[in-house]
């Protein structure tokens, strides 16, 4: 099988001088001796997933598929983005509207606290056959905990507590936490989130594999792609042949030149959530100690009609990483029209994908001409195998890139700030001192 390819020819920077450093940090990852070593379980995960583990995930997915028309994936951040990225990249864009669909529609909750969203979801699910996958290491993360309490109540009111427990699967800690306790007491089927795998690196654990399997996609191909990329980016692969190290080096070279913003661009609507997953992976891993490349995403050509002007002529603090897809499964040809009022007959007989590819090439050339360094990642096609490769490529790259930046890529202390303020404002037990301080602060506003 082919591998995804990396093109750095349009970056305008030399990465060779970063090779020795990148190789050193890659060895720290592979040996488990770098910063954040308690959370390096993802490094060798793809090649260590067993047949027994895959069988268990597929068996649980089969039960949910047989009993449910809708399955609600409850989680936030790394607890849901990876699965959603795979599902939305692979499924028919209009799957939810197809009368001949064979698998449950995957819906999402717990990724926001929008009352209108949750209310409308509950209204929609009334009298529907639905199940729940609740993903949380602790079971106390506010957004998914609220969503699960509401969904669990609705499900039990519709089918009874006994039947509801057969439609709920928990993915959580092996021994501790509110969700582990609830799963044990209620008798929910459950899977373990490994202690040494952080949320944003968890897509190849049951966190990502179970929802993907429920949606009907081949988790074995996903894992195989990741395992192959694990081998392609291992510490025994030299810098010159190691795509993850070269990408990490290019990012750091551009950052050193004042390029503080990386824009990940795709030209396929199905790839939107791959961008969202990437944005969390890199943003949460590197944005600390007042350092880090700001991660942004655009969906092209759509966003060329909004962000295109800024990308072409705005402040030159950006670089662009484009994910290209070489081959499409579909084939749609533009027809001829005798009147040709829209002037499109020059495209008659061409595939829509050919026009899209020329739009991509034209955009890349224009941005390079406008002073935007360009990195290109080429996928032979958009399928489970190459998405598996892509995920592991990005995971290994961000580990090395974070080390090169001088930060611990595997913690996220900054996310506690908003939570502490929110809990103080809501008078959560244990936050009395913070609540009093917050009250005084608000009086001054």
Swiss-Prot record:
One of its GO terms (biological process) is glucose 6-phosphate metabolic process. Belongs to the GPI family. Its EC number is 5.3.1.9. Gene3D superfamilies: Glucose-6-phosphate isomerase like protein, domain 1. This is Glucose-6-phosphate isomerase. It is found in: Cytoplasm. PANTHER family: GLUCOSE-6-PHOSPHATE ISOMERASE. PROSITE patterns: P_GLUCOSE_ISOMERASE_1 (PS00765), P_GLUCOSE_ISOMERASE_2 (PS00174), P_GLUCOSE_ISOMERASE_3 (PS51463). One of its GO terms (molecular function) is monosaccharide binding. Keywords: Cytoplasm, Gluconeogenesis, Glycolysis, Isomerase. The active site is at residues 284, 305, 419. Pathway: Carbohydrate biosynthesis; gluconeogenesis; Carbohydrate degradation; glycolysis; D-glyceraldehyde 3-phosphate and glycerone phosphate from D-glucose: step 2/4. It comes from Porphyromonas gingivalis (strain ATCC BAA-308 / W83). It comes from the Bacteria. It holds the Pfam family PGI. The keyword Isomerase applies. GO terms for cellular component: cytosol. InterPro entries: G6P_Isomerase, Phosphoglucose_isomerase_CS, SIS_dom_sf, SIS_PGI_1, SIS_PGI_2. Catalyzes the reversible isomerization of glucose-6-phosphate to fructose-6-phosphate. It is an enzyme of class 5 (isomerase). It catalyses: alpha-D-glucose 6-phosphate = beta-D-fructose 6-phosphate.
């Amino acid at each position: 099988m082919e591998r995804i390819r990396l093109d750095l020819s349009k970056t305008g920077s030399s990465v060779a001088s970063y090779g020795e450093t990148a190789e050193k940090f890659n060895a720290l990852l592979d040996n488990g001796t770098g910063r954040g070593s308690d959370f390096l379980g993802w490094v060798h995960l793809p090649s260590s997933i067993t047949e027994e583990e895959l069988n268990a995930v597929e068996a649980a997915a089969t039960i949910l598929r047989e009993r449910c028309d809708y399955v609600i994936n409850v989680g936030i951040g790394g607890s849901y983005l990876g699965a959603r990225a795979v599902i939305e990249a692979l499924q028919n864009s209009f799957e939810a509207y197809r009368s001949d669909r064979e698998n449950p529609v995957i819906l999402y909750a717990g990724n926001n606290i929008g009352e209108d969203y949750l209310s409308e979801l509950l209204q929609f699910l009334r009298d529907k056959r639905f199940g729940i996958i609740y993903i949380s290491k602790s079971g106390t993360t506010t957004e998914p905990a609220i969503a699960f309490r509401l969904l669990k109540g609705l499900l039990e009111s519709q089918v009874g507590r006994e039947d509801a427990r057969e439609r709920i699967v928990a993915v959580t800690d092996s021994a501790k936490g509110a969700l582990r306790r609830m799963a044990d007491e209620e008798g929910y089927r459950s899977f373990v989130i490994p202690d040494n795998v952080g949320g944003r690196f968890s897509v190849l654990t049951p966190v990502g594999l179970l929802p993907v399997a429920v949606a009907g996609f081949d988790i074995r191909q996903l894992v195989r792609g990741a395992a192959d990329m694990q081998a392609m980016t291992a510490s025994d692969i030299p810098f010159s042949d190691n795509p993850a190290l070269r990408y990490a080096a290019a990012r750091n070279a551009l950052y050193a030149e004042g390029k503080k913003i990386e824009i990940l661009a795709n030209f396929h609507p199905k790839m939107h959530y791959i961008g969202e997953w990437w944005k969390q992976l890199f943003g949460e891993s590197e944005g600390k100690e007042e350092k880090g490349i700001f991660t942004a995403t655009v969906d092209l050509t759509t966003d060329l009609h909004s962000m295109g002007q800024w990308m072409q002529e705005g402040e030159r603090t950006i670089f662009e990483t484009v994910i290209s897809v070489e081959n499409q499964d579909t084939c749609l040809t533009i027809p001829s029209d005798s009147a040709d009022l829209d002037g499109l007959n020059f495209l008659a007989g061409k595939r829509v994908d050919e026009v899209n590819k020329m739009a991509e090439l034209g955009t890349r050339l224009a941005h390079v001409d406008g002073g935007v360094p360009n990195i290109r990642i080429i996928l032979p096609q958009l399928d489970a195998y190459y998405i598996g490769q892509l995920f592991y490529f990005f995971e290994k790259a961000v580990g090395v890139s974070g080390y090169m930046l001088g930060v611990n890529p595997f913690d996220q202390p900054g996310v506690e700030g908003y939570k502490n303020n929110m809990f103080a404002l809501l008078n959560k037990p244990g936050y009395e001192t913070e609540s009093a301080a917050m009250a005084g602060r608000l009086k001054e506003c």
